[in-house]
Amino acid sequence: MNNIIKRFYKWPIRINEINKNNKDLIGKEIKVKGWVRNIRNQKSVSFIELGDGSSIKGLQIVGDKDSFSKLKYGSSIEVNGKLINSLGNDKEAIEVQLTEPYKLIGNCPDCYPLQPKNHSFEFLRDIAHIRSRGNSIGALLRVRNKSTQLIHQYFNDNGFINVHTPIITASDCEGGGEQFQIKSSLDTKESMFFGQPSFLTVSGQLEAEIYACSHSRVYTFGPTFRAEKSNTPRHLSEFWMIEPEMAFIDLNDNLDIAEDFCKYLIRNLLDSCKEDIEFFNKRIDTNLLSRLEKTLSTPFIRLEYKDAIQLLQNNNHPIKWGDDIQREQEKFITTHFGEIPVFVINWPKSIKPFYMRENEQTDHSNIMPTVSNMDLLVPTVGELIGGSIREERYDKLLNTINEMGMDKDQYSWYLDLRKYGTVPHGGFGLGFERFLQFVTGLQNIKDVIPIPRHQNYCKF
């Protein structure tokens, strides 16, 4: 039994601990609390399956034929009994034999929306406040939780400092204009609360650069917001981003770190969330495990943007140099390379944000200048990571700001980072929810965040 259970001995033992330590607990009296996930009544005996959210596997409770006659699906109960080896055909299975009547904690009426059957994800989105009691969202929450721990562990082990960047900002990192503006009840036509327009952040990158230029390796992991009027399986208005920022690196370093980070997360999730990912492989996407294992065993492809355009043109995709790559084209590229993640690098400057470092033009056949950047495309999801080397040259950055018609005074602080001891630096942003889609096989991004926020949906 782990130290937490020992220290807080009044807590009921959790089901995942029972499954993990059942050899030590066989024959012992235990107390378990949870929700009823299944009820089966037979002639001389009855069974319930109890779940407490700690494991995809429930715990079978055995009583006599009348033990659970009044119990309803979804109710919360306390059980006291002896842990025994199952009397059924599965000799590895365990169960709890009641030694006293269960204690009802919270009854669940017949109108309970979740029933012991398969519900559509669309239905579950309408009951987001209780959908986590089902297997799919319950498993997702455990994978999400472990992923969060692994993210912090990876950066801590590699000497990064975690920076809490602001949620409220005056900057638009991506330049798309899809920001939520903040207005206070104290705002008037003459004065604003912050003295200037302020918004919910679309990225912590610009602020993270401040600390990369003093502490070399930093990362931020927090919520970001986009006022996108899109109610699609790929869009959320509130989502989470992991954004490392590093001094003294080039594009190849950035690519190496991004690939290593992704593989670290996947490798450790396959080990620590094995049962949950096997559940997703069985119930959601039967190719999930093989795809993840292939991702681990194969180097990611590195493909120049110009070569990606040529590949698409050769396969009758309507695209030309200077165009962005669309979702279906992303899917084609990863499929073409055998369902392996693909970095597309060195994109046209004109379709990327202002802060990306302009490449030296050695190939004068290009119509437009390019920037030192990368987009990581992964099977089934599309773009997972966007990153770049940042423009560290003061004059180059100032020229780009002027060319794009931006207010240079608003970005004077950002230019100062280049004025005082500038260094080459870069980083990337990984969309947390898209990563969770990749490792679970869930197709709708609204199903991988606990409480989704999107256009026309903010119930609670």
Curated annotation (Swiss-Prot):
One GO cellular component term: mitochondrial matrix
Alphabetized UniProt keyword annotations: Aminoacyl-tRNA synthetase, ATP-binding, Ligase, Mitochondrion, Nucleotide-binding, Protein biosynthesis, Transit peptide
GO biological process: asparaginyl-tRNA aminoacylation
Subcellular location per the Swiss-Prot or TrEMBL entry: Mitochondrion matrix
Enzyme class: ligase
Principal location listed in the UniProt entry: mitochondrion
Domain of life: Eukaryota
InterPro entries: Aa-tRNA-synt_II (IPR004364), aa-tRNA-synth_II (IPR006195), aa-tRNA-synth_II/BPL/LPL (IPR045864), Asn-tRNA-ligase (IPR004522), Asp/Asn-tRNA-synth_IIb (IPR002312), NA-bd_OB-fold (IPR012340), NA-bd_OB_tRNA (IPR004365)
Catalytic activity from the UniProt record: tRNA(Asn) + L-asparagine + ATP = L-asparaginyl-tRNA(Asn) + AMP + diphosphate + H(+)
Gene Ontology MF terms: asparagine-tRNA ligase activity; ATP binding; nucleic acid binding
EC number: 6.1.1.22
Family the UniProt entry places it in: Belongs to the class-II aminoacyl-tRNA synthetase family.
Name of the protein in its database record: Probable asparagine--tRNA ligase, mitochondrial
Species of origin: Dictyostelium discoideum (Social amoeba)
